[in-house]
């Protein structure tokens, strides 16, 4: 049995930018995940369920667990003195860690993805993304350090809190998964160099918004529902409502996750920096593809911390099909 810590140290030689700092940074995220796992499991017994009454930078009501997870991850990262600052979906602006100007890395995160599912005991997750800073080491980080395209990511990953808790990450050398053993308090390697199955047969989208979707996406959904034995259609529809959970299932079983623009969110709803970029990095490392329907997600130059984007991620052939339908059936 190989633990996450042992695996990270063992694989450092495969990563050209590997340093003890990056190893310690991943360990800090691991610690934060353990704390969140512990408290999610007893959320119904203590007062951390439901809405907090506050709103995040996008005007969305924050759940109590959103704030809890944000504070725990932030504390775990700051305590190691290896991160110069963070950007979070739950923070209006970047958080600069005083006394950590010497650190080389910044972290972007969605502390608790799908938190509205907590009250009904459905899987949720944590998403993280790591970059090398671009401003001089020894100075405080600025927003410039965080507004980097996804192709500059050093590492990215997610933790899914479900029937078991799993941490999945990449440093650009494949995607690896670890299951948390609460009796030992460690994450143990369960899958190395994960890949999307050759063919996907599942599509994940909130079809309740169908009437608001672009024409190309509507046509693609109909394509998924048509019978065609040569392409194994119709595909199966599966939608949990938690990006991490939907992505994880599709990574294991094969499929595509779609969150297009709508009339109410013309630029898309998912956050480019906290959700799209890290999941796109993982998808490509697992042989998949991620797009906004027209452009590779990892090539998009961010303009703001909380920028939103349409998002299509999963098996390469399925994302290719979505892009084709969007090209062939543009909105008037």
Curated annotation (Swiss-Prot):
Record Pfam families: FBPase, FBPase_C
KW Magnesium (keyword) present: yes
Any one GO CC term of the record: cytosol
Protein name stated in the entry: Fructose-1,6-bisphosphatase class 1
CDD domains to which the protein is assigned, alphabetical: FBPase
Matches recorded under HAMAP family: FBPase_class1 (MF_01855)
Metal-binding recorded as keyword: yes
Residues involved in Mg(2+) 2 binding: 110, 113, 275
Enzymatic reactions: beta-D-fructose 1,6-bisphosphate + H2O = beta-D-fructose 6-phosphate + phosphate
Cofactor-binding details, from the entry: Binds 2 magnesium ions per subunit.
Cofactor(s) it depends on: Mg(2+)
E.C. number(s) listed in UniProt: 3.1.3.11
Assembly and binders: Homotetramer.
InterPro entries: FBPase_C_dom (IPR044015), FBPase_class-1 (IPR000146), FBPase_N (IPR033391), FBPtase (IPR028343), Fructose_bisphosphatase_AS (IPR020548)
């Amino acid at each position: 049995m190989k633990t996450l810590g042992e695996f990270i140290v063992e694989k450092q030689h495969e990563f050209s930018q590997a340093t003890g700092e990056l190893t310690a940074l991943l360990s800090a995220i691991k610690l934060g995940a353990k704390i969140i796992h512990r408290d999610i499991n007893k959320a119904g017994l203590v007062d951390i369920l439901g809405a907090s009454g506050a709103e995040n930078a996008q005007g969305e009501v924050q759940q109590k667990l959103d704030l809890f997870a944000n504070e725990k991850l932030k504390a775990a990262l700051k305590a190691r003195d290896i991160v110069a600052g963070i950007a979070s979906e739950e923070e209006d602006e970047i958080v600069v860690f005083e006394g950590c100007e010497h650190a080389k890395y910044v972290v972007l995160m969605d502390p608790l993805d799908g938190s509205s599912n907590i009250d009904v005991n459905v899987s949720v997750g944590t998403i993280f993304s790591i970059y090398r800073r671009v401003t001089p080491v020894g100075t405080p980080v600025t927003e410039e350090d965080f507004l980097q395209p996804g192709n500059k990511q050093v590492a990215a990953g997610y933790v899914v809190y479900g029937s078991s808790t799993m941490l999945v990450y990449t440093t650009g050398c494949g995607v690896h998964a670890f299951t948390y053993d609460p009796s030992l308090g460690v994450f143990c390697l369960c899958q190395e160099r994960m890949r999307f199955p050759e063919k996907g047969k599942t599509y994940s989208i909130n079809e309740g918004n169908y009437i608001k979707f672009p024409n190309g996406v509507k046509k693609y959904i109909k394509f998924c529902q048509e019978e065609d034995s040569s392409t194994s259609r119709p595909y199966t529809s599966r939608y949990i409502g938690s990006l991490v959970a939907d992505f994880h299932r599709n990574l294991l079983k094969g499929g595509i996750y779609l969150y297009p623009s709508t009339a109410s969110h013309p630029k898309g709803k998912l956050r480019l920096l906290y959700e799209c970029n890290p999941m796109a990095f993982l998808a490509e490392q697992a042989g998949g593809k991620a797009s906004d329907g027209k452009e590779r997600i990892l090539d998009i130059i961010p303009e703001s911390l909380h920028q939103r984007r349409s998002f299509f991620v999963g098996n390469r052939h399925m994302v290719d099909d979505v892009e084709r339908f969007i090209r062939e059936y543009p909105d008037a």
